Structure formats: structure tokens, C-alpha cells
Amino acid sequence: MATKKAGGSSRNGRDSAGRRLGIKKSDGQYVIPGNIIVRQRGTKVHPGINVGLGKDHTIFSLIEGRVEFLTKQNHKIVNVKEIANV
């Protein structure tokens, strides 16, 4: 007689890799056109002045400048402020 009951096979044990979402450039950081500022699912952060919104809701810089995050009416907004030429 077997002393061990037959083990069933588990249907768990898979996991997908992380999607590398989040803020890529922080407040006050220097960016050039095309730099990704935020990677997100949906608009957790809304686009403001001098930034574009990709079809996957990625926010990216349209100009050279500094990143600025602010909150207006419970919406997080990201802008890029142009740097004054000295």
C-alpha cells in the first residue's frame, strides 16, 4: 500500500513582469522635447502646458524646460516650464 497520497498539480504559479509604470522625471528636473515624464494606465496625472499625451496615456515633454507638478481641483497636473535664456 502506498503511504503517500497522489499529489495533484497546482494551477497557480504564474506571474507577469511589472510594467515599469510611474513618474520618470520629478518636479524641477530638466527635460528636452520627447522625454517621458509619466508612464501610466489611464490619466492618474493630467497633461498641462507644454506636455503631450500619448495613446497609452504616457505624458511627455514638448519643449525644453523644467517639470512642474501641481494639484488643481483634486487633479494632479504636470507642466513643463520654459527656461528663460540668459
From Swiss-Prot:
| Ribonucleoprotein is among the record's keywords | yes
Region of interest (Disordered), residue spans? 1-26
Look up keyword Ribonucleoprotein and say if it applies: yes
Q: List, alphabetically, the InterPro entries matched.
A: Ribosomal_bL27 (IPR001684), Ribosomal_bL27_CS (IPR018261)
Q: Name one GO molecular function term.
A: structural constituent of ribosome
A biological process (GO) annotation for this entry? translation
Give the GO cellular component terms, alphabetically.
ribonucleoprotein complex; ribosome
Keywords for the protein's UniProt record, in alphabetical order: Ribonucleoprotein, Ribosomal protein
* SUPFAM superfamilies reported for this sequence: Ribosomal L27 protein-like
Checking NCBIfam families in the record gives:
L27 (TIGR00062)
Q: Please report which protein family the annotation says this sequence is part of.
A: Belongs to the bacterial ribosomal protein bL27 family.
Q: Any idea what this protein is called? A: Large ribosomal subunit protein bL27
Give the species this sequence originates from.
Answer: Rickettsia typhi (strain ATCC VR-144 / Wilmington)
Taxonomic lineage from the root: Bacteria, Pseudomonadati, Pseudomonadota, Alphaproteobacteria, Rickettsiales
